[in-house]
Every structure is written in structure tokens, then in C-alpha cells.
């Protein structure tokens, strides 16, 4: 899916080739994209845990994706981890705070993080336990498909 073009068509073709249900509507295509993102987030979190020997119970999502509640819910449910979404304008905030640190107005990363925590709203998404089994099955299939 790295090359530009008819992405819904490419998704449908991939689903057909791999024996998955083919998304017929644009809504079904979007759902397939969001589900695969959530499952890839889980895969990535598990790989990070293997590499670092640490457990990560929370995923922070920043930027424009935080405005999509369905994506955030899928991320929480698909990963089995709490998701903290926000702030939306993370790039601009980070830029300003990096300049403030460089100018000596902010002491460092910890103070900058505290400023963000105290200045911007976030929304927390908790994984729905009643959906766990379905997401686990989807994840097992996802892992088979990606090798």
C-alpha cells in the first residue's frame, strides 16, 4: 500500500488475494483501514515491549488523528491498552516548547511536558473488555497475514 493510486481498489484486491472479506462500501474500506491501523499499533507495541523488556499500558496519540473518535476507540480496543488522545496541535506545541527550552524560558523536557499536561485537554479511551475476544482473533489473523 506504499504506492499512490486507487487505495480502496488496492485494499479490495488484497482482501480478495488473502481470503478476507472484501469491503464493498467506502465505510467498510475505512473500517478496514482503521482496524488494520489498530492491529499494527498492537504489533508495534508488542515488539517494543520485547525489545525494551518493559510493558506499556498506555498509548498516547497526538495530532489530527486524535479528532477521530472511532480511530482512538479502535486503537484502545485493538491494542488492549488505554489510549490518551491529544493535544491536536502537537507539532506546533512541540516547536514552541523546544524554542522555549532553547531560550531558557523552560527548564527542559519534564517542565515542557508538565506545561502540556496543564494547558491542553486530552481524552482517555479504555479498552472494552467485552470486545477483547474478537480483537484477539482479528490480531491472530493479522499476524498470520503479515508473517
PLM region spans:
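A generic secondary-structure boundary signal that marks alpha-helix termini
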Residues: 46, 104-105
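Alpha-helix boundary/capping detector
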Residues: 6-7, 101-102, 142
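Acidic, glycine/GT-rich loop-and beta-edge segments that sit at the periphery of enzyme/chaperone cores
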Residues: 105-147
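Activation-segment/catalytic-loop signature of the eukaryotic protein kinase fold
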Residues: 1-93
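Short, small-residue alpha-helix embedded
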Residues: 92-102
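Short, electropositive, low-hydrophobicity segments enriched in small/polar residues
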Residues: 67-69, 98, 108
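Short, hinge-like loop/turn segments at secondary-structure boundaries
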Residues: 78, 101-104
Amino acid at each position: 500500500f506504499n504506492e499512490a493510486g486507487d487505495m480502496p481498489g488496492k485494499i479490495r484486491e488484497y482482501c480478495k488475494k488473502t481470503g478476507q472479506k472484501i469491503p464493498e462500501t467506502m465505510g467498510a474500506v475505512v473500517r478496514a483501514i482503521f482496524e488494520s491501523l489498530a492491529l499494527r499499533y498492537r504489533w508495534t507495541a508488542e515488539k517494543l515491549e520485547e525489545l525494551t523488556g518493559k510493558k506499556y499500558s498506555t498509548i498516547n496519540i497526538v495530532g489530527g488523528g486524535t479528532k477521530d473518535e472511532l480511530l482512538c476507540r479502535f486503537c484502545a480496543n485493538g491494542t488492549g491498552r488505554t489510549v490518551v488522545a491529544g493535544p491536536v496541535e502537537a507539532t506546533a506545541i512541540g516547536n514552541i516548547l523546544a524554542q522555549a527550552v532553547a531560550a531558557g524560558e523552560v527548564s527542559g523536557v519534564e517542565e515542557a511536558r508538565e506545561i502540556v499536561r496543564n494547558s491542553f485537554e486530552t481524552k482517555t479511551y479504555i479498552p472494552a473488555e467485552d470486545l477483547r475476544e474478537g480483537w484477539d482473533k482479528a490480531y491472530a489473523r493479522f499476524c498470520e497475514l503479515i508473517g
